[in-house]
Amino acid sequence: MNQLSDRLNRLSPSATLAMSQKSNELKAQGVDVINLSVGEPDFNTPDHIKEAAKKAVDDNFSRYSPVPGYPALRNAIVAKLKNENGLDYTAAQISCANGAKQSVCNTIMALVNDGDEVIVPAPYWVSYPEMVKLADGTPVIITAGIDQDFKITPAQLEAAITPKTKALILCSPSNPTGSVYTKEELAGLAAVLAKHPQVYVIADEIYEHITYSGKHESIAQFPEIHDNVIIVNGVSKAYAMTGWRIGFIAGPEWIVKAVNKLQGQYTSGPCSVSQKAAEAAYTLSLIHISEPTRHLRI
């Protein structure tokens, strides 16, 4: 007899992780496979980041961390957001988690109630709708085709918003299409969202440095909706640190406090050693991003 919870029974397995596992199994059998499943950088974690982690181990930096992460890492993230994105946050507006994936899920779980609608532009990362369903919400899919560069328009967004809409998940640069919203395109979406203050934006910016232009624009830059935007980012893609599992949100303090409350009851703070590595990554960020990302553009 299946006695699992209803929420788990309606949850689909991660398609990307299943594909990755299958790819690894075929490779182990000697099959030549090109793995296009998970977003795994081809380069290695930069040496200065690894050295910071080694030092943390030698210094016995191995205790439980505060739930939102150590202040040093959160302050490094605040500086990154200011220097790279021109955005002003405080350490109290940052919450670190076990990867950006958990950060997305934390935010959805903190905001979404039973029956709330969450707008998800398609094509989308496969976990978005499943996370919404896990929170008892309803994913509302907006399809953006190749003729519009896989990016939704303000008219599409306006048409999708209802009294039940709680959030929009916006991924730019996009996983899986690679499409990047321009500042002008984001301004158009922001103008629509400003008319609907009950709608929050979960801005997944984990691929911000994986672009051909090298220029990333955040929807959080627009003052009229800034307080309704929750940025999600982390070290996995830009610094080849997928296995270190450090992500974060930046947003209104009341949402960050709610996420901390939630995270405190199931995973607590992220790995202490990984936090020291991430702190080193953000402290010297742009210096060590440019060369690997240049190779990705070739």
Question: Residue spans of the language-model regions?
Answer:
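A short helix-loop-beta submotif of the ANL/AMP-binding
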Residues: 134-140
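Active-site phosphate-binding strand-loop segment of PLP-dependent enzymes
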Residues: 145-213
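Residue-level detector of conserved catalytic or cofactor/ligand-binding positions
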Residues: 285-298
